[in-house]
Amino acid sequence: LGIGLAKQGKKVLLIDADAQGSLTASLGFTEPDSLEVTLATIMGNLINDEEVEPGEGILHHEEGIDLMPGNIELSGLEVSLVNVMSRETVLRSYIEIVRESYDYILIDCMPSLGMITINAFASADSILIPVQAAYLPVKGLQQLIKTVGKVKRQINPKLEIEGILLTMVDSRTNYAKDISSMLKEAYGSRVR
């Protein structure tokens, strides 16, 4: 998605908010745990009231996008956020620092609903939810949508669900067709 926007001439920042660092690795930065500055570093600096420069830690990719990398350090940050004042809005503080430099800022979240994901929801204008066409991910979607509603009511009133994107759909199987139609029945035009 980010590379597609960049190819349309947009300035894009990708934020890897997943401790597995999959986005970082998939963009060719294959050893995210050895990077000096990552999202965990930046958020840690903000928690400690240290100054953060707009370009600090941002990696530039040959496809024309920028990346704020993520790595395993986010797991430790997740635990420490529990005791932080305004813990839901630390990422928002970072986005306010870099927002003017980009047309789009896309945040790749971990599949859990921990504090890092809540930070992403508190920072976002809208979210696109990828869901595998299988029973358990669809069941998890219900909880995710409840959490999005709660964040919208309590922290970020502008948050909207841009869409629900079905992934790993094998349209040749009845199971996938049933899951797809169940989602479309429940969520209507949000399902893509």
Where in this protein do the model-derived segments appear?
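P-loop NTP-binding core
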Residues: 1-192
